[in-house]
């Protein structure tokens, strides 16, 4: 058994199918949010992750926008649509109301973070967007990007694994250069595993025991067809 994490698949069915097939039934899987929106397959991805045994699904900002949009007012629906929610809204509109309600109940129960200590004794904290001292501040755990610019805030022997900001965008913002669509490492304390699957056509699966990543390419799935 191994323990893996992935984030921000954003409706890319090719990425989820590759990762799903890579995972053994006994592997534990942490999904760090944002299964839906931008791409066409988000609802299917969300449902399959929710149904998978040995899995913790952490809430992302797109799950929150979906929840707010379906339970809220026109402004919440507009914000969700503006951020890529149209493909998800289209699928949900064709689902039975009872199925949508059941899905909303599952989303509402999603945690905002999870912790895992790997075999090397490293405490790994996983949230959608990053780390905050106040782990009750759910808004920061799904939206914050300011922690990229802060030094010395991570406790010793602790690693933050997150998504939310595609690594190409993050590196442009902080002036670092890595190959497009690859994982970002920050001095052994933070790992961003959002490789921007819906833009770069690359998705990441991080082994939390070894801290080694595996990259999946859309071109590989097309070649296999």
Task: Annotate each predicted stretch with a short phrase.
Residues 98-172:
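His/acidic metal-ligating clusters that form di-metal
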Residues 2-10, 123-130, 191-193:
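Active-site-proximal beta-strand elements of phosphoester/diester hydrolases
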Residues 8, 34, 49, 60-61, ...:
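Divalent metal-coordination and catalytic microenvironments
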Residues 5, 29-31, 57-58, 125, ...:
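Residue-level marker for buried hydrophobic side chains located in beta-strands
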Residues 38-116, 121-122, 147-148:
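Active-site neighborhood of divalent metal-dependent phosphoester bond hydrolases
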Residues 1-48:
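N-terminal active-site segment of His-dependent metallophosphoesterases
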Residues 10-15, 37-40, 64-67, 134, ...:
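Active-site environment of divalent metal-dependent phosphoester hydrolases
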Residues 141-220:
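Conserved beta-sheet core of the metallophosphoesterase superfamily
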